[in-house]
């Protein structure tokens, strides 16, 4: 399979020079389901914003679906190739009705009304929202329903890749189960950033672990998430369903002294803590 996402030696810093990403390199192939994990401040959201063309890399190379995101033209073009679901759905559900929200993206692509209508109908069906929802006011929907509308809006673009930032953050257990079922029914490539490691294990086959802007592990989800020593070193915990499935945690080791971790990929360094 060819690579849909190519990230090479990516770096980014927020003013006045605080590094958010440091020498990050990875590739995603068509159809992969990948989880992005790490403690708060690891750089996960920054990485998603760069992949979405909303931030410009400070150094390195980034290409998504053939679009060179190191150029202004590439960052404009990539919006036709991907769908993004933000952590706070109120940041992207802004129209008067559910139908208007889901139709917003396809209309901006310049599609004829008939094609937009077909995409809206298909996207709502894929997230389990019937015709009765089309005229609903998004402000009055539950958190789970808003999440579905946001995903439908992304799917209406018919993206090659779907980026989701903390998709379970405001969902109850039932909402998380329903979201998992929706994602299981999608064939689109997806990158999911989440602190809910159980959800990542349930929905992803591969995991990238970021800490202090560095890629510290990249490998099969069950291997990365079940490694108690790795999780402990980066301030994370093994998901309950995997407890005891991997190596037990040793006594806590200072992160600055931790060796590079490998799950099929070589890493030059682990984060150094201030």
Spans of model-derived segments:
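Helix-to-loop junction immediately C-terminal to a conserved catalytic motif
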Residues: 52
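ABC ATPase NBD Q-loop/coupling interface
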Residues: 61-77
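Conserved ABC ATPase "signature" region
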Residues: 114-132
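Conserved ABC ATPase signature
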Residues: 137-141, 145
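H-loop/switch region of ABC-family ATPase nucleotide-binding domains
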Residues: 194-195
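A short, surface-exposed alpha-helical micro-motif characterized by mixed small hydrophobic
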Residues: 200-202
């Amino acid at each position: 399979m060819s690579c849909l996402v190519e990230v090479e030696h990516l770096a980014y810093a927020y003013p006045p020079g605080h590094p958010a990403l440091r020498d990050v390199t990875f590739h995603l192939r068509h159809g992969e389901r990948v989880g992005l994990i790490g403690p708060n401040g690891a750089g996960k959201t920054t990485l998603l914003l760069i992949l979405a063309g909303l931030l410009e890399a400070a150094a390195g190379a980034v290409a998504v679906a053939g679009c060179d995101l190191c150029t202004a033209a590439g960052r404009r073009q990539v919006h036709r190739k991907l769908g993004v679901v933000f952590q706070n759905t109120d940041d992207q559900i802004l129209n008067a009705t559910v139908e208007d929200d889901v139709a917003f993206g396809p209309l901006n692509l310049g599609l004829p009304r008939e094609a937009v209508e077909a995409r809206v109908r298909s996207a709502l069906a894929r997230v389990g929202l019937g015709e009765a929802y089309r005229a609903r006011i998004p402000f009055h929907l539950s958190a789970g329903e808003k999440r579905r509308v946001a995903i439908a809006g992304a799917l209406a673009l018919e993206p090659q890749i779907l980026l989701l930032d903390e998709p379970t953050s405001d969902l109850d257990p039932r909402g998380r189960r329903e979201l998992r079922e929706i994602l299981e029914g999608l064939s689109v490539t997806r990158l999911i950033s989440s602190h809910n490691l159980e959800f990542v294990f349930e929905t992803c086959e591969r995991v990238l672990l970021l800490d202090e802007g560095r890629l510290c592990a990249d490998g099969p989800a069950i291997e990365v998430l079940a490694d108690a020593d790795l999780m402990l070193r980066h301030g994370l915990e093994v998901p309950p369903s995997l407890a005891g499935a991997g190596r037990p945690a040793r006594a806590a080791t200072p992160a600055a002294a931790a060796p590079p971790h490998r799950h099929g990929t070589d890493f030059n360094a682990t984060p150094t803590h201030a």
